[in-house]
Curated annotation (Swiss-Prot):
One of its GO terms (molecular function) is toxin sequestering activity. InterPro entries: Antitoxin_Phd/YefM, phD-YefM_TA_antitoxins, YefM-like_sf. This is Antitoxin VapB4. It holds the Pfam family PhdYeFM_antitox. Residues 55-85 are annotated as: Sufficient to interact with and neutralize VapC4.
Amino acid sequence: MSATIPARDLRNHTAEVLRRVAAGEEIEVLKDNRPVARIVPLKRRRQWLPAAEVIGELVRLGPDTTNLGEELRETLTQTTDDVRW
């Protein structure tokens, strides 16, 4: 169950409410004692690794008996590592 706060408290204590949400809490905002919004934490974003780093880790793990290394080498030409964000 999520915590509830009046809209006035959200206005007056925004930083504290956002800290609670960042810590994983869901907060429902009330206006005139009725729920009007829910503030929820964002899902964690995937962290992408450069292809060379992934290959290096696979090499460190030992011999490839699945042919995965060869498939990855073929795929390296299709990566976006050189694209600037």
